[in-house]
Regions:
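Polytopic endomembrane small-metabolite transporters, centered on the Drug/Metabolite Transporter
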Residues: 1-310
Length: 310
């Protein structure tokens, strides 16, 4: 009996704990980003700068954990040559920073509903990138499945009227990076010798590039030295501590989400991530269901098409 239960778990539920964690923390982080960055809410003036702080905290956390406890894979990271480190960190960090940074900028201008609708195109870009890198072969049945998934997710948020062109362009670019992100990270990690066996070791390798790229984007695009003029975020010592606390709260959520995501990337495939990503977006939409009845978080109304999708 125990053997059959274990076999069933290994065949059908192996990724369930990490998938569940990914769904939960990703939805929570989307809500955090919308509330902190959205023009209708706190309207934090430098989303990229705050995101770079999240990456810096991830780097520090993963470094301390892997250096303190060797079971987390710190020895593997320390034994990497600089060439091997950069060959993994730079391309993976670039696509990850592009996905996350552009998504956060899009959320400044668009609703969670519209964001989810555009992000429904991500499975298509996963298939394209997986084919380009020869990880998977595109078949007719696979294309049909991907199109059905994308169409079904689109139906869940059809009816959005708050269209914003810049937000749309940012979000579609984020979807392209997202499709490349899972494929490139999986490709780099699976071909690395010796492999990075833990999510913390992987975070330690990827987060430095993500931090520096996001910081550069912030300095060029947002110009933080002038963006905070006239705001209350750093006008007093108390407000400065509150702002840093806000950043640390987001970083904590991001660490939990990325650890789950990296574990799935290491142990599964890009297409399992694709399916999980669709469910993740549905969880994000579901968190906002019933603006007047259940939750007020994202100001969404879950349409009838949600049920058509399932």
């Amino acid at each position: 009996m125990l053997s059959s239960t274990k076999t069933f778990y290994e065949e059908h539920c192996l990724y369930l704990p990490y998938m569940s964690g990914w769904f939960f923390f990703s939805s929570l982080l989307s809500g955090y980003n919308k509330v902190v960055f959205g023009n209708s809410y706190m309207a934090f003036p430098c989303p990229l700068l705050l995101t770079s702080i999240h990456f810096l905290v991830q780097w520090m956390f993963s470094f301390i954990m892997t250096r303190t406890w060797s079971d987390f894979g710190g020895d593997t990271v320390q034994s990497m040559s600089w060439k091997a480190f950069f060959l993994v960190s730079v391309p993976c960090g670039f696509v990850a920073a592009g996905d996350i940074g552009l998504s956060n900028l899009a959320l400044v201008r668009i609703t969670i509903t519209f964001y989810t609708m555009v992000k429904a195109s991500t499975p298509i870009f996963v298939v394209i990138s997986a084919s380009l890198f020869r990880i998977e072969t595109i078949t007719t049945s696979l294309l049909i499945v991907v199109l059905i998934i994308s169409a079904g997710e689109f139906l869940t948020v059809m009816g959005e009227v708050n269209f914003d062109l810049i937000g749309f362009v940012l979000c579609i670019c984020a979807s392209i990076f997202s499709g490349m992100r899972w494929t490139i990270i999986q490709l780099k990690l699976q071909t690395l010798e010796p492999p990075l066996k833990t999510a913390l070791a992987t975070m330690r390798v990827l987060s430095p590039t993500m931090f520096f790229l996001m910081l550069i984007m912030s300095l060029v695009w947002e110009k933080p030295w002038s963006a905070f003029n006239g705001t209350a975020y750093f006008d007093t010592v108390l407000h400065s501590f509150q702002t840093m606390g806000l950043a640390l709260a987001g970083a904590t959520i991001a660490i939990c989400m990325i650890l789950c995501e990296l574990h799935l990337i290491i142990k599964s495939s890009a297409f399992i991530m694709m399916i999980g990503g669709v469910v993740k977006e549905m969880c994000t939409v579901s968190m906002g269901y019933g603006r007047k009845k259940i939750m007020l978080l994202f100001h969404l109304v879950l349409p009838f098409y949600f049920f058509v999708y399932f």
